[in-house]
Amino acid sequence: MSKRTTYCGLVTEDLLGQRVTLKGWVHNRRDLGGLIFVDLRDREGYVQIVFNPDFSKEALEIAESIRSEYVIEVEGTVTKRDPETVNPKIKTGNVEVQVDHINIINKAQTPPFSINDENQQVDENIRLKYRYLDLRRQELAQTIKMRHQITRSVREFLDRDGFFDIETPVLTKSTPEGARDYLVPSRVHEGQFYALPQSPQLFKQLLMISGFDKYYQIVKCFRDEDLRADRQPEFTQVDVEMSFVDQEDVMEMGEALLKKVVKDVKGIDLTEQFPRMTYAEAMSRYGSDKPDTRFEMELKDVSELGRTMDFKVFKDTVEKGGEVKALAAKGAADKYTRKDMDALTEFVNIYGAKGLAWVKVVEDGFSGPIARFFEDKDVEKVKELTGAETGDLVMFVADKPSVVAQSLGALRVKLAHELGLIDNNKLNFLWVTDWPLLEYDEDEKRYVAAHHPFTSPKDEDLDKLDSAPEKAQAKAYDIVLNGYELGGGSIRIHNADIQSKMFEVLGFTKEQAQEQFGFLLDAFKYGAPPHGGIALGLDRFVMLLAGRNNLRDTIAFPKTASAVSLMTQAPSEVSDKQLEELSLRIRH
């Protein structure tokens, strides 16, 4: 077997007249009666190779037997294509290789779907079952290549900035906070379990206490939770931690890192500072803590209508301490029928809204089922507050603030997609700051950490941990890209007393805190530096930069929405002997 001299996708006019040895897969084969043309593919793309009896009758005879996805090696001379056969869509489109030697390395069965037809609609379950074939398709292969380019850019930045790449344990301890853990039974310690890490959070903090100053890791994390398009049971994050820093330092580093990656991978120079918005402002204006700012259509508070209008729904809501907010969709009045509005009402019901009131703006006022409740002054007030004009559709939700935000925030995004308001070429980054430290869980009747229990309260809010925990704000910050949470970070607690107080507010007894996190509390007593960091979702970042619709297209071997590998059939049953060794028994 000869040595390959170059990749198929790199054969260009620079190699004209030279002999090359290529190895790859038969992407396409065309027999023109006396001449056979083959597109030979490898990871860099494909090049046209020609079997011509004038160059080699023997090679032509062998080529007559090859089919799609055969693995072959060829030797030949790079020549210029005839002008009428030039393909300007590919890098190799000006040249072809006249083959004088071919060796069939391996034959292939007919694949269950076409590799060379990117437009063919293939059931995703079939693609996942034959993922090794799916990865041969150029679009998916390019996404995996982009993933490599992103991680390389990340490493270059962090290495240059003095960060140490340090691995942390995969078999660790289960903790009660956060999502459900994946558990690993211990054979040696009967009845005890390791947990796969949801994050290296505690270990990276311990590395700061150890004195390493700057840490990073591109790390696999695991969460046993319900899946959706932008979630996987195992996912990868760019994990970063720094000592002797404040919030501004971490955000500045994170922003510079993201700008470098976008420049390296997309060739886009993001020169402006990323905009910033408080959590309260994001919820008020967009109904979301991760707003998509590629389009306008903001939520507008029209609660004063509940005090001036004779409309019971608005009036009762405001009297009970709720609010009324409106969403004005530009030029949408004629695009939505009564049936469409019923469907939108059902949509907001999902988010807890009891209904969706709406009007269409016409020349002489409003039309629609609640138009009669609006006097002229009310019409003008709505126009003033929302910026609505003739031809617009205005929708209202009246409820408690959390329901209004969730329902209208989701409706805003849905309408933007339906009305084509989103520019998919935009990359709109946004920092969301000033997060609440805690949230109250109505089901468990206790406070839970908005981010995690190790996030530091703002200095001025330390006293509120005793008096009004729900009002305390965190030294926390999220980075949002095009309506997705790309990453989150915070300045951490580095004082044992404050950390113990935080555990107390979260409902831990001293004994529980010591049992679960005693090693961290002890470490704080030996001189812990102030520290903070950020974790960026790599899978999601690749998805957004590559313009894909779900995370599965960014991962070489992903799981389905039900956390199954269709290719390997994981998870699977294990033998009774294995269970016995682990002192486990399956209950059916």
From Swiss-Prot:
Q: Does the keyword Glycoprotein apply?
A: no
- Kindly provide the name given to this protein in its UniProt entry: Aspartate--tRNA ligase
Family assignment?
A: Belongs to the class-II aminoacyl-tRNA synthetase family. Type 1 subfamily.
- Binding, L-aspartate: 177, 223, 451, 492
Q: How does it assemble?
A: Homodimer.
Keywords associated with the record: Aminoacyl-tRNA synthetase, ATP-binding, Cytoplasm, Ligase, Nucleotide-binding, Protein biosynthesis
Which species does this protein come from? Staphylococcus carnosus (strain TM300)
Q: Where does ATP bind?
A: 223-225, 232, 485, 537-540
One of the Pfam families matching this protein, by short name: GAD
A cellular component term from Gene Ontology for this protein is: cytoplasm
